Curated annotation (Swiss-Prot):
It is an enzyme of class 6 (ligase). It catalyses: tRNA(Arg) + L-arginine + ATP = L-arginyl-tRNA(Arg) + AMP + diphosphate. A motif ('HIGH' region) lies at residues 122-132. This is Arginine--tRNA ligase. It comes from Neisseria gonorrhoeae (strain ATCC 700825 / FA 1090). NCBIfam families: argS. Monomer. InterPro entries: aa-tRNA-synth_I_CS (IPR001412), Arg-tRNA-ligase (IPR001278), Arg-tRNA-synth_N (IPR005148), Arg-tRNA-synth_N_sf (IPR036695), ArgRS_core (IPR035684), DALR_anticod-bd (IPR008909), Rossmann-like_a/b/a_fold (IPR014729), tRNAsynth_Ia_anticodon-bd (IPR009080). Its main location: cytoplasm.
Length: 572
C-alpha cells in the first residue's frame, strides 16, 4: 500500500469538509515520533487564500478527521500545523496484508511506461576505470526500481565502439602482427598506451592510422575484422566487471555508436530539410536560440562537420530517434556525468524541434558528480594514474574479507571469502548510492566498510540479525491477526508501510539515495524495536506479532537492498 497516499486522501477529504477543497495538503512525516506519524502543513497556505485564521481553520480540519478509520488523532500545533497519529488497528491490518503479499504490499504503478535507460557506456579499447562506476551502479539501481514498480525497462549500454582511436589501434595491431605473426592482444590498456605513443611521436604512423579510419568507415572487411577484435575483447572485460558488480547489464544490451552509422547522414539531411540545420563554414549546424554562447549569440549544435564527418551530437540524435521510433520508449533516461548536462539539454531541445521527441515522451538527463579522493581531488592511484575498476573491486573484496576474518576467526577460508565478496562489493555500491547522485563524494575505505552508521555492512548485518531470530523462533503464524500495542511496534509498522511510496519516489525522480535513506531508517528503527520489545521472550499474540514485524523488516531490507543491486547473507 501507499501509506502516504492513503493518509493524504483522508486529509484531502477533511480539507473539503472544512471548506478548502482542492488546496494542497502538504503532508510530511513528522520529524519527532512523539508528535505523531504525519504532519499536515498546507492549512496556513489555504488560510491565507481564504482569508481565515490559520489555527481556527486547522481545528476545523482536525475535527473533520475525528473518528476516521485511518487517523487516531489530529492535533493542531503552532500557527496551523496538524499532527496526525495513525490507528494501530489500521497499521496492524496493513502489516498483516503486506507480510502475506509476494510484493510486500508494494503495488505496481497504475501508469506503466516503456523506459529506455542509457548507462555505463564506456569507451572501448580501454579497460573500465573508476570513472565508469557511478553511471554503472546508479543506472542499474534505477532500472531495477523501475522494473519492480511495473514498468518495461530496456537497458542500453551505448559503448564508444567507433571513432578515430580505432584507426590508431588497428594500425598498431597490423604493425605488431607484421613483426610477429603470433601476436595476440593481452593487456588492452598497455596496448592502447603503446599505440598512443606511436601516434603522437610518429607522423607517418599517424597518417597510416587516419587511412585505417577511412577504411573502417568505408566498410573494409579486413579492417572491420580487426576492429571487431578490439570490440569483443573490450566487451568481455566490461562484462566481467559487470558480473563482479552484480549488474543486470548483459551483452544483448550493448548498442554502441556503430549501430547508428547508417542513420547519421539521413538525420543530418532531415534536419536541413526541416529548416533546423543550416550550412555554416561547410558544416551542418542547428542554431539554438534557447542557449547562448559567450557572445550572447544562439549556441551552435553541430550535426555534421566540414568535410562530412560526424560527431557525438550526430550519433546521439540518431540514437534518440531510434529509441523513440523503434523501441517505442515513452521515457528516456541518460545516466551520465553532470559535466555533459549542456550537451544533453541541447540534444533534447533539437530532438523536440525535429519531432524525434514527441510531446508525450520525456527525455531526462540523470547527472551525477565525481568520486573524490581524501585529498579533495578526483580519485586516483598514489602515482596519479586512473584507478582500474577491476583493481578497485579486488581491493574491496580483500579488505572486507580481512575484516570478516578479524571479526570471526573461526570462519573457514571459503565462507570468509564468500562473505567478504558480498560485503566488499556491497560497501562500494552503497557508499555511492546512499549519496545524492548530483553531489561529489569522498571515497573512504574505512567509512564504507564500517559496521556502524549508514553503510551496506550495517544494513547487511541488520538483515542477518533478523534471520538469527527465526533460527531460534520455532513455530509462528504469519497468517494470524497482527496486534500492535507498544509505541515502537507502531513506529516500525508505519515505517515498513512507507516502502511503496519510497520506491515510487525513486522511480519518478531517479534518486536511489531516497531508498538507501529509507532502508537505513527501517534498520535503525528495527534495532530500537529489537532492544525495547523482546521478541522471543514475549508470549501469545504479542510474540507472534513481533515475529511478523521482524519478518516483514527482513523482507523489506532484502528486497530494498536488491533494488540497490546489493546482496544479503543469512549469516555474517
Amino acid at each position: 500500500m501507499n501509506l502516504h497516499q492513503t493518509v493524504e486522501h483522508e486529509a484531502a477529504a477533511a480539507f473539503a469538509a472544512a471548506g478548502i477543497a482542492g488546496s494542497p495538503v502538504v503532508l510530511q512525516p513528522t520529524k519527532n515520533a512523539e508528535h505523531g506519524d504525519f504532519q499536515i502543513n498546507g492549512v496556513m497556505g489555504a488560510a491565507k487564500k481564504a482569508k481565515q485564521n490559520p489555527r481556527e481553520l486547522a481545528q476545523k480540519v482536525a475535527d473533520a478527521l475525528a473518528g476516521n478509520a485511518v487517523i487516531e488523532s489530529a492535533e493542531v500545533a503552532g500557527p496551523g500545523f496538524i499532527n496526525l497519529r495513525l490507528r494501530h488497528e489500521f497499521l496492524a491490518q496493513n502489516i498483516h496484508a503486506a507480510l502475506n503479499d509476494a510484493r510486500f504490499g508494494v503495488a505496481k504503478t497504475a501508469q506503466p511506461q516503456t523506459v529506455v535507460i542509457d548507462y555505463s557506456s564506456p569507451n572501448l579499447a580501454k579497460e573500465m576505470h573508476v570513472g565508469h562506476l557511478r553511471s554503472s551502479i546508479i543506472g542499474d539501481s534505477i532500472s531495477r526500481v523501475l522494473e519492480f514498480t511495473g514498468n518495461t525497462v530496456i537497458r542500453q549500454n551505448h559503448v564508444g565502439d567507433w571513432g578515430t582511436q580505432f584507426g590508431m589501434l588497428v594500425a598498431y595491431l597490423v604493425e605488431q602482427q607484421k613483426d610477429n605473426a603470433a601476436f595476440e592482444l593481452a593487456d588492452l590498456e598497455q596496448f592502447y598506451r603503446a599505440a598512443k605513443v606511436r601516434f603522437d611521436e610518429d607522423p607517418a604512423f599517424a597518417d597510416t592510422a587516419r587511412e585505417y579510419v577511412v577504411k573502417l568507415q568505408g566498410g573494409d572487411e579486413t579492417v572491420l575484422a580487426l576492429w571487431k577484435q578490439f570490440v569483443d575483447i573490450s566487451l568481455s572485460h566490461a562484462q566481467a566487471v559487470y558480473d563482479t558488480l552484480g549488474l543486470k547489464l548483459r551483452p544483448e544490451d550493448v548498442a554502441g555508436e556503430s549501430k547508428y552509422n547508417d542513420d547519421l547522414q539521413p538525420v543530418a539531411d532531415d534536419l536541413v530539410q526541416k529548416g533546423l540545420a543550416v550550412e555554416d563554414d561547410g558544416a551542418k549546424v542547428v542554431f539554438l536560440d534557447e542557449f547562448k554562447n559567450k557572445e550572447g549569440e544562439p549556441a551552435a549544435f553541430i550535426v555534421q562537420k566540414q568535410g562530412g564527418g560526424f560527431l557525438y551530437a550526430s550519433t546521439d540524435l540518431a540514437c534518440l530517434r531510434y529509441r523513440i521510433g523503434r523501441l517505442k520508449a515513452g521515457r528516456l533516461l541518460y545516466v551520465v556525468d553532470h559535466r555533459q548536462a549542456l550537451h544533453f539539454e541541447q540534444l533534447f531541445t533539437t530532438s523536440r524541434k525535429a519531432g524525434y521527441l514527441p510531446e508525450d515522451a520525456k527525455a531526462e538527463f540523470i547527472g551525477f558528480g565525481t568520486m573524490m579522493g581524501k585529498d579533495g581531488k578526483p580519485f586516483k592511484t598514489r602515482s596519479g594514474d586512473t584507478v582500474k575498476l577491476v583493481d578497485l573491486l579486488t581491493e574491496a573484496v580483500e579488505r572486507a574479507t580481512a575484516l570478516v576474518k578479524e571479526k570471526n576467526p573461526e570462519l573457514g577460508a571459503d565462507e570468509a571469502a564468500k562473505i567478504g565478496k558480498t560485503v566488499g562489493i556491497g560497501a562500494v555500491k552503497y557508499a555511492d548510492l546512499s549519496k545524492n547522485r548530483t553531489s561529489d563524494y569522498v571515497f573512504d575505505w574505512d567509512a564504507m566498510l564500517s559496521f556502524e552508521g549508514n553503510t551496506a555492512p550495517y544494513l547487511q548485518y541488520a538483515y542477518t540479525r533478523v534471520q538469527s531470530v527465526f533460527r531460534k523462533a520455532g513455530e509462528w503464524d504469519a497468517t494470524a491477526p497482527t496486534v500492535l500495542t507498544e509505541p515502537l511496534e507502531k513506529q516500525l509498522a508505519a515505517e515498513l508501510l512507507k516502502f511503496e511510496n519510497v520506491l515510487q519516489s525513486v522511480a519518478d525522480t531517479a534518486y536511489p539515495h531516497y531508498l538507501a535513506a529509507y532502508l537505513y531508517q527501517a534498520a535503525t528503527l528495527f534495532s530500537r524495536f529489537y532492544e525495547a520489545c523482546p521478541i522471543l521472550k514475549a508470549e501469545g499474540a504479542s510474540r507472534n506479532s513481533r515475529l511478523q514485524l521482524a519478518k516483514l523488516t527482513g523482507n523489506t531490507l532484502k528486497q530494498g537492498l536488491d533494488l540497490l543491486g546489493i546482496d544479503v547473507l543469512d549469516v555474517m
